[in-house]
Amino acid sequence: MLLEQIWGFLTAHPISVVTTILIVYLIHITLKPLNRVRRLGDVGLFFGKPELKGFYRERQLERLKLLRRVGDMPPVFPNGWYCVCESEKLANNQIMEITVLGQFLSLIRSESGAVYITDSYCPHIGANFNIGGRVVRDNCIQCPFHGWIFSAETGKCVEVPYDEGRIPEQAKVTTWPCIERNNNIYLWYHCDGAEPEWEIPEITEITDGFWHLGGRTEHEVMCHIQEIPENGADIAHLNYLHKSAPPVTKGSDIIKTDLSDPQPAVQHVWDGKWEVKSEEDRHCGVMHLNQFMTFWGYKVPLTSSKLVAEQHGPGIVHMLFDFGIWGKGVVFQTVTPEEALLQRVRFRIFSNIPWFFVKFFMTVEAMQFERDVFIWSNKKYIKSPLLVKNDGPIQKHRRWFSQFYTENSPKMLKDGSLSNQAKSIFDW
């Protein structure tokens, strides 16, 4: 009887039902935090007109990698901390495969919630912990092939289940230093085996629960890692590449956007500077940026923002925002070198800013970032650029960034291979 009444209502009021469903759906997607993910080839690369699809697209991507002129590049894996996972993506008692520094590793969360990173291959006969391995005894991992058990903390084998004899001394898996900070998990890498040389600052507003996750974006970018943070010192490009407002023009696609328009209808106006934080914190570079929007040359009220972006080493940026009456927050930009010329870039915002403003801000930020992706994915690295007076402190930034390269930093050879493989500081 009830089903008949429901069916009768649906058939009698189809427009009302469809409208209600549409409204509920729109509310859902509006309130849902932004999760914008772009894989390699989704943005930044040109696949012809008409655009290539499927197999032909993949083949063209391989050709682009092969034929692109990369230039005289610095080493490909600088020393520092790298984000390998967002905290909420790793559950207790889980082993997760991660890609970083040109290799697969195993990210582990124990039953009690601690995080560890180890090499992925069992030293017994070489099985992969990521494929069928499991967490046991709180903080140990068990190989899926023969059941050998290793401490995720020390890497040592603690049990061979079918043999009661003495465990071989060399039965050990390599571990990597890691830390969980600001709802991200980071790995420490140093090509000379040095212990962590600085700490990642803790944002107390996140720890104390005053700021909450409001959205994220993730991009795969085909370039050298140094190209991305160098943007912070390249002040001149802001008022050209990022001048027009993406939602009003052609979004992120610079092929379809007339960047030479001297007076876009809606325009971002930028002003900033970059400098080394201090001699004591020489691993940290700071960019101060002021921005507002104009409409036909007139400043738009309530669009002003001030940004202090602190870059901690080669792969972490903390962007501290003050939006005035809208509130405050931080955007984490993390750059992780998965391969020599493949970076995974994540943006995550934590704030007390209203949800609708956060979603708008992160969407515009992503579109602006994707304009840079078009440049990075197709440019070559020039060791000695031809700079003019108002280009900004690009050379100063390069001298600062060079501290993260040392004698054993892996270099990309002419055939595309690496001079040496990245390894844990515990392998020295």
From Swiss-Prot:
Keyword Lipid metabolism: yes
A Gene Ontology BP annotation from the UniProt entry: cholesterol metabolic process
Cofactor(s) for this UniProt protein: [2Fe-2S] cluster
Annotated positions binding [2Fe-2S] cluster: 122, 124, 143, 146
Family, similarity comment: Belongs to the cholesterol 7-desaturase family.
PANTHER family on file: CHOLESTEROL 7-DESATURASE NVD (PTHR21266:SF32), IRON-SULFUR DOMAIN CONTAINING PROTEIN (PTHR21266)
Protein name: Cholesterol 7-desaturase
Provenance organism: Caenorhabditis elegans
Organism classification: Eukaryota, Metazoa, Ecdysozoa, Nematoda, Chromadorea
Gene from which the chain derives: daf-36
